[in-house]
A protein has these predicted regions:
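Expand to "…catalyze enediolate/carbanion chemistry for C-C bond making/breaking, isomerization
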Residues: 1-98
Length: 98
């Protein structure tokens, strides 16, 4: 059976610690640089900015390589959009206009 990936942000918050989440990376290379700095999470902006849905799998894989939690803001508050975003690797979802 597949194992869930550790969610560094969730684990730190549950332990009462602060988590560092960086917003703005829009390519895997930027995420690799952040991974080397030890950030806990990356905010992938899917509502505003240059990120297209097709970019999300590569960005979440880059996060996985460094053990970084991928937090994705989806562009629509629709169950299908949220499910698909989780299916391609997002560990946390931010829903707009809620």
């Amino acid at each position: 059976m597949a194992e869930l990936r550790p969610n560094r942000v969730k684990n730190k918050l549950a332990a009462g610690l602060a988590a560092t989440v960086v917003a703005g990376p829009h390519n895997a290379e930027m995420i690799e640089h952040l991974g080397a700095l030890g950030v806990d999470g990356v905010w992938i902006e899917g509502e505003h900015g240059p990120i297209d849905y097709a970019d999300i799998p590569d960005l979440t894989r880059a996060c996985d390589l460094w053990g970084i939690t991928s937090v994705v803001r989806v562009n629509l508050n629709l169950p299908g959009v949220i499910y698909r975003t989780l299916d391609v690797g997002a560990q946390a979802i931010v829903v707009p206009h809620v």
